[in-house]
Amino acid sequence: VSSSIDTADNPFVRVREENNVLLVALTSNRGLCGGFNNNVIKKTKKLVSEYGESSVAVFPVGKKANDAFKNSTYLATDNLPQNSASLWDDLNFENVNSLTEELMSSYKNGDFDKIIVVYNSFKNAAVQIIKSEQLLPIVKADSDSENTDNTDYIFEPSQEEIIVDLIPNSLKVTFYKAMLDSLASEHGARMTA
């Protein structure tokens, strides 16, 4: 179904030249969890060097990322909340939702051309996998080459109305999942440290 929907006019799908990239680094507020925080910080610094300091901004979520990047020249300070570490104190969808809306607004307004989330993905209590996942622009799913089904779908309400609601909600859930993955990974890393 997703391959039959035209999303070209949606601002969250439109690919732009990558002049300003935002890296959202998810770390914890506390230490004593092995390499959990350090892995995110190292991966973020690697991405900064790949994109170039002049075209990157880092938005830290968590005290450890904030401490690591507070004196850097590429710390994101405009149009984003400054006390993002408090999200971990009461992690719920509503709190993450407001941050995600600000990220989407910054992208939609052209402040950033690409937003990447760097976090630890939970595999099990002993293993956390460092991930850098593109949040915006949305990457269109590859259509299966074997699936050549040319079914004509009828949408109620219209495609445009569905997309206007579906894409922002999908982005909110994707970012919330990254936050939950990071929290579960932190607890696993703390147990095995």
What is each residue range found by the language model?
Residues 1-193:
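C-terminal beta-strand-loop-alpha-helix "lid" module of Rossmann-like NAD(P)-dependent dehydrogenases
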